Amino acid sequence: MFFNFKKYFLIKVFFFVLILTLCYGLYLYVKINRFINGKVWNFPTSIYGRIVNLEPGNSYSQKEVLHLLKSTMYRKVDLVMLPGEYSIKNNTIEFIRRAFDFPDIREDEFHARLYFNKDTLVKIKNIDNNHDFSFFRLEPKLIAMLKSPEAKKRMFIPRNQYPEMLVKTLLAIEDKYFYEHDGIHLSSIGRAFLVNLMAGRTIQGGSTLTQQLIKNLFLTNTRSILRKINEIYMALILDRFYTKDRILELYLNEVYLGQDGDEQIRGFPLASIYYFGRPINELNLEQYALLVGMVKGASLYSPWTNPNLALKRRNLVLFLLYKQKYITRKIYKDLCKRSLNVQPKGNIISSHPSFIQLVCEEFHKKIYNPIKNFPGTKIFTTLDYTSQNAVEQAVKIEIPILKRKKRLKDLEVAMIVIDRFTGEVQALIGSSKPEFNGYNRALKTRRSIGSLSKPITYLTALSQPEKYHLNTWISNYPLSIKLDSGQYWTPKNNNFSFSKKVLLLDALIHSINIPTVNLSINIGLKKLVDSWLLLGISKKYITPLPSISLGAINLTPFEIAQVFQIIGSGGYKSSLSSVRSIISDDGKVLYQNLPQSIHIESSEASYLTLYGMQQVVKSGTAKSLGTIFKEFSLAGKTGTTNNLVDNWFVGIDGKQIVITWIGRDNNHTTRLYSSSGAMQIYKRYLQYQRPVPLVLKAPNNINMFYINNLGELFCKKNNQHNRMLPIWSIKNKKICNDKLSERFSIKKKKNFLFWLKNLF
């Protein structure tokens, strides 16, 4: 009787435990199913640089295209066979462009050969079909990945796009019975149990890849019997209801492979980019071995922090491949001789923090929601890697030189590079240490702009062709102006010299203060303020005082860039932008920037002002720049404020406008003039970013005239006329002083034929 009772009791307990186990298994199945069939990961927002469009006739030199390829980690080889490889022969570059999901369409690999003639791309040939191409684009560089809510970064690649050599290496080291077991491997568990029992502590694991995946996706790192039971049970469920390739795909994209600051590097695709700078399918076997070796302990075997341990671990992986007959002894020996050859930490995905701040600000304005609500988005920006690199190199070289010369420790800098016509921001830094994230002076620092304000005064005057031309005389007498406060303001020239009068153009070329103030008084303070407002400066930053003509207005480098974009493009405003398009994680276009220009300033006055700025570089305050880059006809303007607190330079070539500011955060003197400070950084920039000649095309109402020493215009040259100026006038007949010129003469012979001609 007792025996039967015990028997029935045990049966009941058995079925109770069985039912409980099945119910718990059902719960785990639902949990796994919902997770894996749903959205497994929230990917971080990826930010890309500019997509480079190549067309025959582009002003791209062979050297510049090589720099673009190297920046995206293309590898030089003798014979191009794989994506990401290139070769050079004479005036050609042959390479296979990687497949890439562009904002509008996915483009496959493309085998191309580019032909160059001097500094111009002349032909693009498709090697596969031997046809010429009229248009071709390079994949952009990944410049940043924004923080994800889970503090994990990854890039997803489907199982069929993983190289088989990587998969074989992983399985050989971590789970060689993966395709045979049912999620767990009992002999491995038993072996690990005995080893740990004998050691008295946990020193060996018996987990399969499936178990490791379960732990990464669902469990914690806490070591306990209960956690191990859950791990085994869930591994059995996962293996029963999902294919081996799906499990492997999840593992390859989930495994922990290092740290980037406070964020984890997850998955082989992103680890490949971080450590080697190239996609996972372009790596060599020894590089796969390093990554697979890091699975055991990414922190311990990090090639950045523990290179010797990482090398030993990599070579051990290679040895195991040799022992399992995946490679020969010779290959094993050869591969072990190779260095780790990893990229310096932060060298590949270098975020350019100042530029990224601008991108994020624009992102929030365009999308209207916090960035965390858009995981996995791709932001395609306007950042030109060549220009950004040139800016950073110029600052890293010149700022230490200037600090040593002036014995300063706290000299700061901001630079912004924009496309002259579209207003796209191609490069930006806000600190003397471009790689550090912090206060962005390019966007936030509001400083007196000094003589950078003068071109706006001359632009305002030249917008009135009935009154002002480049040959207009302006008073250079000392003056004192009584302000509304009752005080007197007495401007002075920099060299404390004065003269009776000076030509308007010469006052701009040599940045003379007194004529500029006199000109602002003559044109009227209201018109000058209206010009600033028209150029996009907020009224709250404008104080309507005569000193505004000499720079008594505080602006940011970003605002200054917008002002000179309008002047530099002939009076057309294109709002500055850093974002071209934003694509959601499912491929939908969330935002597309279509650059639009608004004609807000006189084309003639803008042309004349820009012409004057060309003469500044040719023979004025920026003459030393013009001497070095004479063939490029650059335009520019220096700007230095009182007590040498701030110094500025704006440089303009055929395609870019560059604003440079140097100052100190405590507003103390820099002991630098613009020509010896900001302009020197611009000079250095041009050594890394080859300028394009600035060729000005005069509007129809502007013609070139000769000028004599009295500033009088002539249509024909003689011994007294040694200078030519562009003049805006619809009534050309009333400009010239030539007595022999019938077309342009002021005093014409009014004979019958002349009268008859004018009658009709």
From Swiss-Prot:
Q: Which reaction does it catalyse?
A: [GlcNAc-(1->4)-Mur2Ac(oyl-L-Ala-gamma-D-Glu-L-Lys-D-Ala-D-Ala)](n)-di-trans,octa-cis-undecaprenyl diphosphate + beta-D-GlcNAc-(1->4)-Mur2Ac(oyl-L-Ala-gamma-D-Glu-L-Lys-D-Ala-D-Ala)-di-trans,octa-cis-undecaprenyl diphosphate = [GlcNAc-(1->4)-Mur2Ac(oyl-L-Ala-gamma-D-Glu-L-Lys-D-Ala-D-Ala)](n+1)-di-trans,octa-cis-undecaprenyl diphosphate + di-trans,octa-cis-undecaprenyl diphosphate + H(+); Preferential cleavage: (Ac)2-L-Lys-D-Ala-|-D-Ala. Also transpeptidation of peptidyl-alanyl moieties that are N-acyl substituents of D-alanine
The EC number(s) given in the record are 2.4.99.28, 3.4.16.4
Give residue spans on the Cytoplasmic membrane side: 1-8
Q: What subcellular locations does the record give?
A: Cell membrane
Where does it primarily localize?
membrane
Topology Extracellular: residue spans: 30-760
Which topology term describes how it sits in the membrane? Single-pass type II membrane protein
Quote the cellular component terms of the Gene Ontology held in the record.
Answer: outer membrane-bounded periplasmic space; peptidoglycan-based cell wall; plasma membrane
Catalytic residues at: E174, S451
Pathway of this protein?
A: Cell wall biogenesis; peptidoglycan biosynthesis
Q: Which UniProt keywords apply?
A: Antibiotic resistance, Carboxypeptidase, Cell membrane, Cell shape, Cell wall biogenesis/degradation, Glycosyltransferase, Hydrolase, Membrane, Multifunctional enzyme, Peptidoglycan synthesis, Protease, Signal-anchor, Transferase, Transmembrane, Transmembrane helix
Known Gene3D superfamilies for this protein? Biosynthetic peptidoglycan transglycosylase-like, DD-peptidase/beta-lactamase superfamily, Penicillin-binding protein 1b domain
The transmembrane residues are 9-29
Q: Give GO terms for biological process.
A: cell wall organization; peptidoglycan biosynthetic process; proteolysis; regulation of cell shape; response to antibiotic
Segments carrying the region annotation (Transpeptidase) are 392-684
Q: Which GO terms describe its molecular function?
A: penicillin binding; peptidoglycan glycosyltransferase activity; serine-type D-Ala-D-Ala carboxypeptidase activity
Q: Does the keyword Cell wall biogenesis/degradation apply?
A: yes
Transglycosylase: region residues: 136-308
Q: What does this protein do?
A: Cell wall formation. Synthesis of cross-linked peptidoglycan from the lipid intermediates. The enzyme has a penicillin-insensitive transglycosylase N-terminal domain (formation of linear glycan strands) and a penicillin-sensitive transpeptidase C-terminal domain (cross-linking of the peptide subunits).
Instruction: Describe the family membership recorded for this protein in Swiss-Prot or TrEMBL.
Output: In the N-terminal section; belongs to the glycosyltransferase 51 family.
State the protein's name.
Penicillin-binding protein 1B
Organism expressing this protein natively: Buchnera aphidicola subsp. Acyrthosiphon pisum (strain APS)
